[in-house]
Amino acid sequence: MYKIPETLSQDIKKFGDLAKGYAASTVSGTEFKAFRVPMGVYEQRKSEVYMARIRATGGVITPQQLLKVIDIAESNGSNLLHITTRAEVQILNLDLKNVQNVLTQLQEAGLATKGGGGNTIRNIIVSEFSGIDPDEAFDATPYAMALTSEMVAEADSYLMPRKMKIAFASNPSVVDYAGINDIGLVAEVKNGQRGFKVYIGGGAGSKPTVGWLYKDFMPVDDLYALVKAMKKFFNANGNRKNKHKARIRYIFYRLGKEETFKLIDKYFDEELKAAHKLDVESYVTPKADSNGSTIVLPFKWGNVWLEDKEKLAVLRRLLSLLSEIGSDTLRFTTRQNIRLRNIPENRKAEVEALAKEYDAEAFDQPVVLSNIVTCTGADTCRLGICLSKGLANAIFAALGKSGLDLSLLDDARINVTGCPNLCGQPLWSDLGFVGKVLHTDHAYPAYQIYVGADYVNEPKLAESVGTIAAYNVPRFVVDLVKRFIDVTGIAATLGSKLSFGAWLRSEAGKADAEAIARRYTDIPLFEDDKNPYFDWGSEEVFKVTQRGKPECSAGLFDMITVDNDSINDARGKDNYAVIFHASRMLLVTRGLDPQDAAGVFDAFKEYFIEAGYISKSYLPLIEQAKAEGSEGKYDAAQAEALADAVIALYKTMDDSLQFHSPAEATAEAPKAEAAKPSAEEKKEEPAPAAKAEPQSADSAVKPTRSKDLRGVLCPMNFVRTKLELATLQSGDILEILLDDGKPIENVPGSVKLEGHEVISQKQEAEGHWTVLIRKK
């Protein structure tokens, strides 16, 4: 195990002091968050409910430690452990008053959460087979442990522009996560010397890319110097203004590979002169019996529920048995399961019996069903668009009932993510799905399909083969697997074996996937069949504005991204879709959310064409689209030109949501009015209370202007707040009225992130809130 940092005790004490101050309102939420997040403690979707993320380098934890984690979770009120896609474990559903106790008890067990969140070096990934893979160059685990011990103790590991992710691969033929991390290290042996092939700048999140090959071979002794140099390089060159463009890959996008490598070389050369080496030997464990077995203990979506006491008792017995066998007998995996390893042949039957007793159905199911990975999605993530867990469950059920021989899929990877942020890593899978919004006469949940990532040989992201309604995805998956099984049968007659991933990486596999996707492209209109307009796991008709948004600005830009991506998808294929998404793309910046296509075109005409931001030459095109809809015949060049004009305008938008003419970037654009509600919004907006004029929450502070935002959903309420602030002078005070719940939880915090001062927020007797904001 890695070495616990010496400062951990005082860090935990400081956490406790800040938590008490926060509870007593003597410490601000911002100050508390700034400390607790790098300590690996996050607030969950429900206010004042917390999660502690335990660092488990390489997924390593001893059976005795995991038993202790279960005890700690239970005794502190948690009902759930969660295994993450970085092979670590979280304790969820904690009250703040119990978190310090959790951290202290974890420390006593040789575990820590420090560095589990924020702009830090996150949990380091190592292949789950490292140390037991007969084809590995060498076991990378001791190097990851030694590196973790150094990094969690260094202050500059907590001051970076954004998080840094590191991954090791022990087998030179299986690059895996080393190909998509900020620093990827693939074990190699050359001329008897150990070293690493080094990739830099990879990332599977938004604007994804595989890493750039920095070193074909780097001696293991240079490992510390490399990572130290990367921290210094990142601190000096990372983007601290825009967290959405702050990861290392954005430096490559900005400067190009050659210039970026030159800068890294400078820092690397300086660190090599210091000649500091990692103490790897302290972390080497005796080699286990090479004849030992490995078994996967599956957990659906990585969840280890603690409420079923009978099952939990079986898990405790299993962990106790593993403790008798040895300490290196389990690892968390990036597929959110536990891999049992180094199981002697004479104990294998005992271990398998307990694993099966814990969850017989999961233990006996085909491996592919245990390998479906999903982000939390819109049911718990405030940035989510689609209910990704609902879709994952639907895929799971459809495959399970298909009657197909799923054993032929071996350990195929299927990944689902609910929005373009790509937290579920769909572009690093055999078959991936990315949630988005599409429209007919009504919005509906959809998924862009990706196939064929190469995580085995040379790193390569999956490629898109189409976009279909969420409703059709399970049937698409079953049809795709049927086709694969047919192809596998043909291959078998020719004496060859084909994996699901290899097939989807082939041109023939991609072509088959694209052809099957085309069968499911069209859906009926809403008035003809409402089923495709419901998301999986939801009983309400799909609507983007129903999704919660934690950071209002993030939600705003996410909605813009949906339309921007839809424009790119539709170019050359569907001119009406290009016109529709171009017209809708920037309406959110004016606090508008029309519920039908006619409303979109009317609002675009009023707020962008008539306001002078977009040329009036596009008016006939907009009127045609409004009148003829998807059945019309449109000039492709005009549709594309409109989209280009809207995207160019978006690039001129400043932090106050004001636009400048793309043709004359220096000229002032027309002043945007605070958004006028559409006719539909006027109907929905509640009538003012008997005392129509909002009253100040602080009689000593008189507002310059007041705005009633009750009944306005997130992020529209934030947009309207920004637009109001844009018309005020620095130091002026804006008073807004917000509903209880998400509006008061989200808007003040997002306003603070913009640099404005929230003077006060007070809940009124009627239940709504009055908030005073001083413009920066």
Segments the model singles out, each with a brief description of its role:
Residues 1-568, 669-686:
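Peripheral terminal and linker regions in Fe-S/redox and tRNA-modifying enzymes
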Residues 108, 754-764:
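A glycine-rich helix N-cap at a beta->alpha junction
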Residues 554-569, 583-673:
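Long, charged low-complexity segments
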Residues 568-577:
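Alpha-helical protein-protein interaction scaffolds
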Residues 695-728:
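An N-terminal amphipathic alpha-helical segment
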Residues 716-723, 740-756:
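Amphipathic alpha-helical interaction surfaces in cytosolic regulatory modules
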Residues 770-776:
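Core SAM-dependent methyltransferase catalytic element
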